[in-house]
Amino acid sequence: ETCFSENVADIISAHQWLADNYRTPQLLIGHSLGGAAALKAATSIKDLKAVATIGAPFDPAHAVLHFADRISEVDATGAVTLTLGGRDITISREFLEDLAETNPESYLPRLRKPLLILHSPIDQTVGIDNAQNIYRTTRYPKSLVTLNKADHLLTKPGTAAAAARMIATWSQQYLIPDTAPTGADVIPEGVAISRTTKAGRFTDVVRTGTHTLYTDRD
């Protein structure tokens, strides 16, 4: 059981943990209700370079209004489980009260990060008008790109890969690339270097000449 405000807080906490233990994330991507949470969280994370959303509702309450017939069960049972954005969410009275207090008009104008809004014009779960409202309410630089023929979960062949390519291409203009290794930092082909990170004594970072991997030795 969770609520929208807790989702936002989790994103902020995860960003801080990664910044403290590995490297500071530069790009925040969110889908559906997670996209709405990413938008609000981004207003509180100053180190972000860019934000991208996929099928995000303008008002988080919109995501549950699609299931209005089930929401009425909350009064009778206290909670109901719905599938939103491909995952099960328990909708309780507290969840609905939290959504009722969420006003995107109050925080979206404060988003000062480059924004990419991806949305399908035939999305039957979160309508394209949500993307238009997000675009209308946020500041530049911003871009709205339609994912033609895609469903809400991007399950049709090629749609998820297309969205990923769009985000990757668009974000390059804002992200700071890793410094290319030189001299002693270059790792020869066929060699891997492993070291324990400050994230914990069971966590290792393994580097090769082309990849960096994080492993758990527990």
Where are these regions (language model features)?
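Hydrolase active-site cap/lid region
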Residues: 46-94
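Extended beta-strand/beta-hairpin segments
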Residues: 170-218
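Short alpha-helix in the alpha/beta-hydrolase fold that links the catalytic acid
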Residues: 113, 127-136
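Alpha/beta-hydrolase fold nucleophile elbow
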Residues: 21-32
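Short beta-strand/loop motif that positions the catalytic acidic residue
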Residues: 111, 117-119, 123
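Catalytic histidine neighborhood in serine/cysteine hydrolases
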Residues: 138-153
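Alpha/beta-hydrolase active-site loop
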Residues: 2-21
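Catalytic histidine-centered segment of alpha/beta-hydrolase-like enzymes
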Residues: 150-162
